[in-house]
Amino acid sequence: MASYGMNDVKNGMKILVNAEPAVITDTEYVKPGKGQAFTRVKYRLIKSGRVQEVTMKSTDTLEAADVVDTDMQYLYSDGEYWHFMQQETFEQVQADKNGMGGAEKWLKGEEQCVVTLWNGVPIGVQPPNFVELKITETDPGLRGDTSGGGKPATLETGAVVRVPLFVNQDEVIKVDTRSGEYVSRVK
């Protein structure tokens, strides 16, 4: 397995920490006035999302993780697993609830996603930045009611987003999956 020296470490690199994949989010080289120089490495564990920091001497190394980001098409969910297919090879993988990481509420079928694979197993799914979903349930907007600035709406996938008062049930809206916010109505 490959390893990185402290001079080679950069943001975005995938490493193994205690046999768990992580991505480096920040590195800082520190040279104190007295003593040996060291590097502070901040990383985020891919599976749990926890951020941790470690201080490494310049002679230490970090083990590279065999993590691959692959473009895949979402096919369907059987209730327990979400199935994805690679477009070129038609190879299919299935992700469980932990591997989905909350992305399941934005997927209805045939969306292109970035699936993070570790040893051939999905450990993270990134849905498209914007999705168009139909509103299945929302309160009717009352004329003159502008106090709240919005109302909750349930989408066809079960996700709940805050929408403006003029948006009605059975309309299709565009949602930003990174923030979970309403963007616009779809004509």
From Swiss-Prot:
Summarize the protein's role: Involved in peptide bond synthesis. Alleviates ribosome stalling that occurs when 3 or more consecutive Pro residues or the sequence PPG is present in a protein, possibly by augmenting the peptidyl transferase activity of the ribosome. Modification of Lys-34 is required for alleviation.
Gene that this polypeptide is encoded by: efp
Name listed for the protein in its UniProt record:
Elongation factor P
GO molecular function list: translation elongation factor activity
Q: Which SMART domains match?
A: EFP, Elong-fact-P_C
Which residues are modified to N6-(3,6-diaminohexanoyl)-5-hydroxylysine? Answer: 34
Q: Which NCBIfam families match?
A: efp (TIGR00038), PRK00529.1 (NF001810)
> What GO terms describe the biological role, i.e. biological process, of this protein?
peptide biosynthetic process
Q: Which organism is it from?
A: Xylella fastidiosa (strain M12)
Q: How is it modified after translation?
A: May be beta-lysylated on the epsilon-amino group of Lys-34 by the combined action of EpmA and EpmB, and then hydroxylated on the C5 position of the same residue by EpmC (if this protein is present). Lysylation is critical for the stimulatory effect of EF-P on peptide-bond formation. The lysylation moiety may extend toward the peptidyltransferase center and stabilize the terminal 3-CCA end of the tRNA. Hydroxylation of the C5 position on Lys-34 may allow additional potential stabilizing hydrogen-bond interactions with the P-tRNA.
Top-level taxon of origin: Bacteria
Q: Which Pfam families match?
A: EFP (PF01132), EFP_N (PF08207), Elong-fact-P_C (PF09285)
Q: Which UniProt keywords apply?
A: Cytoplasm, Elongation factor, Hydroxylation, Protein biosynthesis
- Functional pathway: Protein biosynthesis; polypeptide chain elongation
What is the annotated localization of this protein?
Answer: Cytoplasm
Stated family: Belongs to the elongation factor P family.
Q: What is one term from the GO cellular component aspect held by the record?
A: cytoplasm
